Amino acid sequence: MTFKYSVAGLPFEGEFKVTESKFDINFRDPVQSVFSVKFDLMKSNAGFPLATTAMKQVLDAYRFPEVTFESKSVEFNDEKFSVLGFLKIRNVSKPVNLIVTVLEDYNSESEKIYFSIRARFKRRQFGADGYYPLVRDAIIIQDVLTLNKSRE
């Protein structure tokens, strides 16, 4: 999953390695939908080796190798899911809102659903304040993902 950040005003991109994700869509009552995702920081990168090393240090990846997001509430309006949940980084949990936009028509029979995901948070809220203000506080998660229908 792609994330964006800024160093000295210049934009950079990295990738969080998703190890587990779940998006159970309740087609009859979308507010009953559930979203969760888990990232492995040790397999993630910040775009180039020096930044990746710094990211792992700042996020204390050796002690806390996983980042998780668990939804607490989901609203659906105008083909968008607004997913309020808790993001856990460095063993610190803070509320974050994800916007999940459906990119094409779907229904309960769809085998795949394509959607974009976007979230913004401030890393210093999680105690990840290394290299600030050179590396800005805002982290933006933005990507296009494919949801495959579960065979359960």
Model-assigned labels for residue ranges:
Residues 1-152:
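Low-complexity, acidic/polar, glycine-enriched regions of mature
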